[in-house]
Design a protein with these regions (language model features):
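Glycine/Thr-rich beta-alpha phosphate-binding loop at enzyme active sites
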Residues: 95, 102-142, 178-185
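Alpha-helix-loop-beta-strand connector modules within alpha/beta enzyme cores
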Residues: 38-53, 80-95, 129-151, 185
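Catalytic cores of alpha/beta
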Residues: 18-23, 57-65, 96-108, 152-169
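Active-site glycine- and acidic-residue-rich loops that bind
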Residues: 10-15, 88-99
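Glycine-rich phosphate-binding active-site loops on the catalytic face of alpha/beta enzymes
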Residues: 71, 75-79, 113-124, 162-185
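A structural preference for long, well-packed, hydrophobic secondary-structure segments
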Residues: 3-18, 39, 62, 66, ...
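Hydrophobic faces of well-ordered beta-strands that scaffold small-molecule active sites
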Residues: 3-8, 30-32, 46-51, 69-73, ...
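N-terminal active-site wall of soluble small-molecule enzyme domains
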Residues: 11-21, 25, 31-84
Length: 185
């Protein structure tokens, strides 16, 4: 179950607190989506921060200071690469970005975070089945790299992702249904 990570996209602090409170006790890590609005309060669970802002340098450092166990960015810079000394650094790759453009950067990070939806920043978008080929390509070139996949994951597709060697499944709107299907057996 450590492979299934709930994604939280909060609109304000009370929404963040409410969503964290709804996470099952067995979950040890949450994934917080960070948009342009800075929403933060102390939470009682380990978290990683997915930085989807225009100024990733500023926000990535801030979330590392707040205790993020991992930070995911979509653009690498020297400032961000230095964060690797303080937390796990992930490279987010949007679904519509050609993998070939990002391959040189993969060796510089601790893990890659492949988006499996066409549009980031909102939950509930449909799963893009083309992610399966993207995972295979990454595995061929980087057999040891940790891979997380984010977006549209549900009871119909999660097992195939795990079978392809995905290390973490980041699940937003479908988390409760997937979690319940796996824990209520």
């Amino acid at each position: 179950m450590n492979k299934i990570i709930p994604a939280i996209l909060a609109t304000d602090i009370s929404d963040l607190e409410l969503k964290v409170a709804q996470i099952p006790d067995e979950v040890k890590l949450v994934h917080i989506d960070i948009l342009e609005k800075d929403i933060y309060t102390d939470i009682d669970i380990d978290f990683e921060a997915h930085i989807m802002t225009k100024e990733p340098d500023k926000f990535a450092s801030l979330w590392v200071e707040r205790g993020a166990k991992g930070v995911i960015v979509h653009k690498l810079s020297e400032n961000i690469l230095h964060l690797k000394n303080r937390t796990k650094l992930g490279l987010g790759i949007e679904f519509n970005v050609p993998l070939e453009e990002m391959l040189p950067s993969i060796a510089k990070v601790d893990f890659i975070h492949l988006m499996s939806i066409a549009q980031m920043g909102e939950q509930g978008h449909p799963f893009e089945s083309g992610i399966f080929d993207r995972i295979k390509k990454v595995r061929e070139k980087f057999p040891q790299v940790e891979i997380s996949v984010d977006g549209g994951i549900n009871t119909d597709n999660y097992q195939k992702l795990l079978d392809l060697g995905v290390n973490k499944l980041v699940v937003g709107s479908g988390f409760k249904k997937l979690w319940n299907s796996l824990t209520k057996k």
